Amino acid sequence: MTKAYNIIHHKFDVVVVGAGGAGLRSAFGMAKEGLNTACITKLFPTRSHTVAAQGGISAALGNMGEDDWRWHMYDTVKGSDWLGDQDAIEYMCKNAPDAILELEHYGVPFSRTEEGKIYQRPFGGMTTEYGKGKAAQRTCAAADRTGHAILHTLYQQSLKHKVQFFVEYFAIDLLMEDGECRGVVAWNLDDGSLHCFRAHNVVLATGGYGRAYFSATSAHTCTGDGGGMAIRAGLPLQDMEFVQFHPTGIYSAGCLITEGARGEGGYLVNANGERFMERYAPAAKDLASRDVVSRAMTIEIREGRGVGEHKDHVFLHLNHLSPEILHSRLPGISETAKIFAGVDVTKEPIPVLPTVHYNMGGIPTNYHGQVIIKDGKNHNSVVKGLMAIGEAACVSVHGANRLGSNSLLDLVVFGRSSALKAAELIKPASPHRSIKEESLEKIINRFDKVRHANGNILVAELRLKMQRTMQSHASVFRTQEVLDEGAGMISEIRSGYKDIKINDKSLIWNSDLVEALELDNLLDQALVTVYSAAARKESRGAHAREDYPDRNDEDWMKHTLSSIDEAGKVVLDYKPVTLTTLTDEVTAVPPVKRVY
C-alpha cells in the first residue's frame, strides 16, 4: 500500500506535534539547545487553542501582596482533590516565578501596576497562608487576552531559533517499534503527500479532546489527536474520567467568559437575584474552585432557580464594575458578550451555564514530559523516544480538578522541562535506527481504509451522536445507571465508525477525511472516559457521583489507567498517587476534607 502514495522521508533530532503554548515552548527550547527540531501542526501556529486562554497564568510573584510558591502548591494540591502528584506540583509551582520572568524577557506584554510590575488578579482556589489567609492575587494577566499574548511571543521565539515548521500537516500515527517511538507519519493537506518523520524524540503537544462533547469552550480543532495516537500505539491514558466544566460559558453559544471576570469582582445570581455561591462556599464565594461553582450552578438550575424563559441558566453580573475597569482589564469579554449574548456588560448581566472546558486526564508522563507506563511493579517505566506535554498529557499536576490559570503555567513549565530533558538525552545529528517497512505499511493501510470508506453513516452524523451522548451521560453530575447506559451507547457509536462514508476521495484539502480521522481519535477517548467514570465509585474533583457523594481515599486515591484492547474493549488498571514531594524545601500536603 505504501507504493500507492507519495511518501516523503525526513530525519530530525526531535519532532514536536502541535504548535500551541506547550508545543512552541518545547520546540524552540530544543532548537536553542542545538537539536534539529521540526514542529508539525494541523493549523497555523497562532491559531492554536492557547490563543483563546483569557484570564492569566499563575505564579507566586507577590506583586500585589505577600505570596509564596509553597502556598501555590498547597492550593493546587487541594484544588486537585488530592489526586495530583505532589512531586510534579512542587516542580511546577517552584518554577512558576522564573517561567513568568522568562516570558516577560521574551516579550509577553503583561498588564502593569502603577509601579510598573506585572499585574496579578485573584482567581478561584488561590489563597494565602495555606488556605488560612485571604485570596491570593497570583494570576499574571495581559488584560483578558493572556493566551494570545503568550502564543504570539512563543511563535516569535520559535522563528528566532529556527524551528522548522510543517504547517497544515495532519499527524496520523506514531511509528512504534519494540516499545519505542521512532517517529510520526503525517499528511500534508496542501498537496496531498504523506510524510514519514524519523526522530529520536517525538513530543505530543496536541491539546485536549473537548470536542467529544456537544457544548465546549474548545475550538473545533480540539480533537485529542495525540491521545488517539497513543491509544492506537497500545499506550494507556490516565484519569480520563475527570473533565472540567467551566462555570461561565455563554448560554447557548458555549464561548468562554474568563474566571478573571469574577476575579475582578463579578458575581453570579439566580432567578431570585441571590448571590447563591455564599451558600455553597462561604469563604471563597464566587472564587471557589471550578468544580464547586459548576455543581452549585447546576443545583440552582435543577431546583428551579434558573433564569430565562426555560429557567436553564444563571446570570453573571459585571455591570456594577466601572466602565474603565471593564475596558482596561476585560476588553475581550465585553466584546464577546456583545457578539454572542447580545449583552452590554456595563448595563446588564451575562447569561451563563457550565460548559466543558478542560481535560485533566491524558497521556501519563513524569515532570520531564517523558511518557510513562506501568511495567510490573514499576509504575513509571519510560517509553523511549516519546514525550507528551500540555493538555494532551497527564503529569499529573491538576489531579481531579484544575485551578484556573494553572494551565498556561503547565504549558510553559513542562514545555521547558521537556526541552531540557531532550537536550540531556539526545546528541545532535546522531544516526537514526532503522524502521521496519511493515510499521509504516500498517499506518498507511489504516489511512487508506478510512479514505476509501464507503459505508452508510456520515461522519458529522456519527460525531453528533457521540457529542450528545457524552453531554447527557458524562456531565457535571453522574450516576451508575446513567454512566453504564452511556458506556453502552458510546461503544455502539464507536462500532458504527466502520460503517462511515467518505464522499471526497481526494488527498488535497479533504476536510471530510480530516474530520473522519479526528472522529476516530475522539471516539477512543470518549470511550475510555465514560468507562473510567463508571468504574470510579466516589466523588472527587470534577467527577461528581450522586450515588457516591463522598470522596473515598481508602479505595480510590489512585490514578486510573485506561486502554483499549484489539477487540475494542476498555481495559482499566490503577496506580498510586505520588503523595511525597520532590525536595525537602516543602512538606507534603496531607489529605483533608476539601472546603472553600
UniProtKB/Swiss-Prot annotation:
The keyword Oxidoreductase applies. Pfam families: FAD_binding_2, Succ_DH_flav_C. This is Succinate dehydrogenase flavoprotein subunit. Keywords: Cell inner membrane, Cell membrane, Electron transport, FAD, Flavoprotein, Membrane, Oxidoreductase, Transport, Tricarboxylic acid cycle. One of its GO terms (cellular component) is plasma membrane. One of its GO terms (molecular function) is succinate dehydrogenase (quinone) activity. It comes from Rickettsia conorii (strain ATCC VR-613 / Malish 7). It catalyses: a quinone + succinate = fumarate + a quinol. GO terms for biological process: electron transport chain; tricarboxylic acid cycle.
